[in-house]
Amino acid sequence: SYAKTKEKYQDNIVYSLQDKTSWYFNFNVNRKTYNHTTKTTDEQKKSTQTAILNKNFRQAINFGIDRTAYSAQSNGEEAASKTLRNTLVPPTFVQVGDKTFGEVTASKLVNYGTEWSGINLADAQDAYFNKEKAQAKFAEAKKELEAQGVTFPIHLDVPVDQTNKNAVSGMNSVKQTLETVLGSDNIVIDVQQLSTDDFGNVAFLAPNPAARDYDLNFDGWVGDYQDPSTY
């Protein structure tokens, strides 16, 4: 663990630059399987799926996740920000003229709304966590969703390998942050602790899209060659 490493090496700890691997949360927008869920009614399933298809809801979740707190569960508070990445394609992966890929992407984000103005996509800092933006986006989403007959709170099933204690702590951190920022009367994160085999089968190693048994999942990808299309 980071705590033991720090105790042993103290002032000799240095941090390398991040590699081409990117980690991110993704939504299951068309869930078909419910073998691992806390939902008890079809109404809850329908409400969750309708919410996930709502752009403002997804953005509320994005702005409501404290990625630094999540990372701290595995890397310690001092090293937490060192692992953070804000784009699927690493921001310095390629150049576009005299600007990095991240700089060009950031300049285009404002076209999607003023909430994206001034976003810094550089590595090693959280570009998105913002309580006010999360709450504002959720308020918009709730108004739209209630008009569609959606009932609250929205339950999101999030799977995790129960043998990976750091991952379990990380998901519990996400649960605490989102339910605090958005209100547990609005959203409930149901952390599904699964065996290693079950976790693989419903997530990264799922044989087909229909087997992906979750609403929100933490996943990753690493590029194979030096072009953004590899992501």
Show which residues each predicted segment covers:
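Flexible loop/turn segments at secondary-structure boundaries
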Residues: 23, 33-34, 70-71, 79-80, ...
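Short helix-loop capping/hinge motifs at secondary-structure junctions, enriched
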Residues: 31-57
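Structural recognition of the beta-strand scaffold that forms the well-ordered cores
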Residues: 14-16, 23-28, 60-64, 71-72, ...
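Periplasmic binding protein-like
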Residues: 8-13, 180-231
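Append "and occasionally in soluble cytosolic enzymes with long acidic Gly/Pro-rich linkers
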Residues: 51-181
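Extracellular/periplasmic catalytic domains that process cell-envelope and extracellular macromolecules
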Residues: 7-8, 18-20, 54, 149-152, ...
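Solvent-exposed coil/turn segments that connect beta secondary-structure elements
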Residues: 19, 30-32, 66, 77, ...
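Extracellular/periplasmic solute-recognition and catalytic clefts
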Residues: 1-38, 68, 72-74
